[in-house]
Amino acid sequence: MNYEFEREIGFINSQPSLAECLTSFPPVADTFQSSSIKTSTLSHSTLIPPPFEQTIPSLNPSNHPRHGAGGRPKPSPAGSRGSPVPAGALQPPEYPWMKEKKAAKKTALPPAAAAAAAAAAATGPACLSHKESLEIADGSGGGSRRLRTAYTNTQLLELEKEFHFNKYLCRPRRVEIAALLDLTERQVKVWFQNRRMKHKRQTQCKENQNSEGKCKSLEDSEKVEEEEEEKTLFEQALSVSGALLEREGYTFQQNALSQQQAPSGHNGDSQSFPVSPLTSNEKNLKHFQHQSPTVPNCLSTMGQNCGAGLNNDSPEALEVPSLQDFNVFSTDSCLQLSDTVSPSLPGSLDSPVDISADSFDFFTDTLTTIDLQHLNY
């Protein structure tokens, strides 16, 4: 142990002077700073930092009695007795300002509240107003989160009135409102900021609802239009199908009626043929009896008219009514008429007019040629 102590003493003596180190030793902070400065300026060895080696005796209190046992002068124990560093290295004494710091660390105050508390402690409570002291108390006692400001109904009413007229406040007006409502300027400013954000959200929600309502109305109108178009198309299809059905039914009825009328008409014609030639023959005979000299003229006119009708190339000349007009002079009727108008006809009917057989032969020949020409066309 003496060897180690002598080595340490020799190391210390290698420094400029032991007295300078010992005189600067009693306060720990001063010894550390002065020795570090001196060693940094005067020492030339850079291998081992001398300040660390110099502070070893002061940091180890067990070495001080050993220094006394060695018979060396002991100014360091007196310095160690006067300074609280040996106990403070591990457990420093608690001063009031240290207690405040520990309390601040335990409660984890926000920096704004800590600064306000420090300012309150420095300047005193007389410099702060009642409202600010309440805010500081709320912030310091409430933990990490600041409590919300409780506004009264009158304050809210006045703030809402002011916001209705002015969304943004100038500083003089803000100070005036804060003084009237017993609030701080910061509280008024924050309230107006929050109210502007609320107003913005409300307007955006209204715009979104209006746009959604417009979109829904447009979609509903489009759906209604589509439904109306579908209805109109369906009605048109029904009307067209009904018209087609009516037309088909009408044509079917017409065809049925024509089919019914065709055989009935044919039967009527066939039944009336035996009678109609008689009536026509009787009429012809009467005409022949009363107007016998005009028969060649009538025949000539009939022949001319028929020739004109045959020579005409217009479609009206070939229509069905013209053929129906000549159906009266059919081959059967002509044959019947030729049979009736026989050489024995004057004797059977006892007519006083004498008609030659040549004239009747000419009449029958002309009628047959006319009918044959119509049949050919």
Curated annotation (Swiss-Prot):
UniProt entry keywords in alphabetical sequence: Developmental protein, DNA-binding, Homeobox, Nucleus, Transcription, Transcription regulation
Keyword Cytoplasm appears in the UniProt entry: no
Subcellular location: Nucleus
GO biological process, one term: muscle structure development
CDD domains, alphabetized: homeodomain
Pfam family, one: Homeodomain
UniProt similarity note: Belongs to the Antp homeobox family. Proboscipedia subfamily.
Name of the protein this chain belongs to: Homeobox protein Hox-A2
Species assigned in the record: Papio anubis (Olive baboon)
